[in-house]
């Protein structure tokens, strides 16, 4: 027979009080234990929340520091790119002039050598055009 059945069958107030008292003590003990467990759970939850908040703040600070470093690197890269751009503008025409001279120089040397080594005799045709005849010396 369980405790509730015994309470229902009790006849007098004293008998009812005797039956209810162990139930009330058990409920009070359970309530105290529940309060204690809830308090421990709340403390653990608050501790975990504090750790989580601390970790979030550290992560946020790390992201802020990383963003700052990335801005500095981006500024340095931009400065280097600007320097390279301005340097390339200054050397652009010099490069083209050097390429032109280097490509024309062999042609000029061969032309001068051929003029010095060959005897050029002017010829006039019947129609009046003038031709240079190359004669080897």
From Swiss-Prot:
- A single Pfam family it belongs to is Mobilization_B
Q: Which InterPro entries match?
A: Mobilisation_protein_B
Q: Name the UniProt key words of this record, in alphabetical order.
A: Conjugation, Mobility protein, Plasmid
Taxonomically, which superkingdom? Bacteria
Function of the protein: This protein is essential to promote the specific transfer of the plasmid in the presence of conjugative plasmids.
Question: What do we know about how this protein assembles, alone or with others?
Answer: Interacts with MobA and MobC to form the relaxosome.
- What's the protein called, per UniProt? Mobilization protein B
